[in-house]
Amino acid sequence: MLYNKYVKYPKVKLDNREWPDKQIEKAPIWCSVDLRDGNQALPKPMNVDEKIKMFKMLVDIGFKEIEIGFPSASETEYEFTRKLIEDKLIPEDVTIQVLTQAREHLVKKTFEALKGVKTAIVHVYNSTSELQRRVVFKKDKDEVKSLAIKGAQMVKKYSEYTEYSESKFVFEYSPESFTGTELDYALEVCEAVLNVWKPSKENKAIINLPSTVEMATPNIYADQIEWFCKKLLNRESVILSLHTHNDRGTCTASSELGILAGADRVEGTLFGNGERTGNLDIMNMALNMYSQGVDPELEFSNLNDIVEAYEECTKMVVHERHPYAGKLVFTAFSGSHQDAIRKGLKSLKEGKNKHWEVPYLAVDPHDLGREYEEIIRINSQSGKGGTAYIMESDFGFILPKAMHPEFGKVIKKKSDELDCELSPEQIFKFFKEEYLENRSPYYLKNYKIHSIQNIEEEKNTVDIEAVISVNGKDTSIEGVGNGPVDAFFNAMNNKKYNGCKFISYDEHALNIGSHSKAVAYVQIESQDKKYFGVGISDNIDTASINAIVSALNRSKLK
């Protein structure tokens, strides 16, 4: 690869940088640009109805600033702006934002679209990067700065017209391609714009510093932001905003570090929609904060519904591995991961943890409207813990610990044979085939139990008479023991159908619908190998005897 054709991005000279020692303690001002920056990047931009649906969803999520479009760019954008205002669809506590280039006719059209608005942010921009000055516009620094000043003057002029006297306007300026602009020049241009607007602590202006193209590592962007914050005159009268893109795949980190570096505000989209590789995903950054115990002041407790509405409006698809929102996020294919999750959830249920602490799960899926049933997925790489979790959580079977490896091998083999992931229903189907439906060579037809009380020895025993099918032929057996399980086991030995060693016995109630059944687990040892059997019935004795038959049948098949 021709790596020599690229030049390393320069470092920022910043003495005594402070951002590495800081933590995010509160949410920034969030501004959604889904309806503008996100919409312009769609193969098929949203129509007015889809935009209204998206706008209402953004309001429900909790955004207080929403960039709704570029009203001077098209009739659809203009019509949408007018509809929001005329139909009074903008809540009292929400401010819309519109974008315009620094050209007279575009600024005029923008303000016409805003007639009757209560509050609006007017966002004006021009590119300041060295590359675009030289290659695209062929203008020098003074000429580009002059464009910015004229844009600032125009939006100020129109905002002061009497027809807008009932509206409040906040001004925002972006030196587009800030990350490709010399820092001292970007500062010079922004201060020239602010000198026109003359913001105050009571009436602040917004300076937005976009990584229009992500060009370096997040720490470099943080250095740029801290440098800018420290050098900017009248800083207390300015809301410093970030607008990161994801060309290098690190825009979330850039925005997070930018907040540490002193920024007050963040622009982005849901799920990172935007030009090329996309914008900052505000949902991602907000839930990163949430996972650290910081209130993001945005509501994502119905994340599945948000994903569905987003996909319907944009015709885009949220990736299965997308942080927090993807279908596979709260899943675990690895056996060791599944086992750890199972133990973590059990510990949480028992109240042992004050805070959320579950291995491999950064947040509680329930907080986002997700379900625990989605967590464990079973394939050929899965382990014993995952299959045991599915059997307990989905079907109520609490498999003995020693049974986990055995059943895990059964499921692994089935998954290998089918070459696919197994659903809970398939897992239960294979469980029944392996443990409950195997009737060869033995099958219990009927039995009778008699209690024997030896008064002299103060000992109670049980006598059992049973009819079993052996390879399709009915045979009567009889045995005595300390209980039904022991008696039946001995009865099988008496007929030499057994020859096995009894290892363990477990049982528990099994609730299926409105009926309660008993399930029993028996482990035996035959020729130095151990086998489990399972029985289920309304009667615990029947369940226990069937568990023995199940174990014996499995031992004959191996």
From Swiss-Prot:
EC? 2.3.3.13
Q: Name one GO biological process term.
A: L-leucine biosynthetic process
> CDD domains given for it?
DRE_TIM_LeuA
Q: Which PANTHER family match?
A: 2-ISOPROPYLMALATE SYNTHASE, PTHR46911
The ranges of region (Regulatory domain) come to 438-558
Protein's UniProt name: 2-isopropylmalate synthase
Q: Which residues form the Pyruvate carboxyltransferase domain?
A: 28-304
